[in-house]
């Protein structure tokens, strides 16, 4: 899980979602998981 000020999809399989007001990226590749904050 990467925590960064701006989250962007890295590959085609990355999905940008909102959970509890936080923007997150979920993906098949665990290295692509990101959270804003």
From Swiss-Prot:
It comes from the Bacteria. Keywords: Ribonucleoprotein, Ribosomal protein. This is Large ribosomal subunit protein bL36. NCBIfam families: rpmJ_bact. It comes from Staphylococcus aureus (strain NCTC 8325 / PS 47). The gene is rpmJ. GO terms for cellular component: cytoplasm; ribonucleoprotein complex; ribosome. GO terms for biological process: translation. InterPro entries: Ribosomal_bL36, Ribosomal_bL36_sp. GO terms for molecular function: structural constituent of ribosome. Coiled coil: none annotated. HAMAP family: Ribosomal_bL36. Belongs to the bacterial ribosomal protein bL36 family. The keyword Ubl conjugation does not apply.
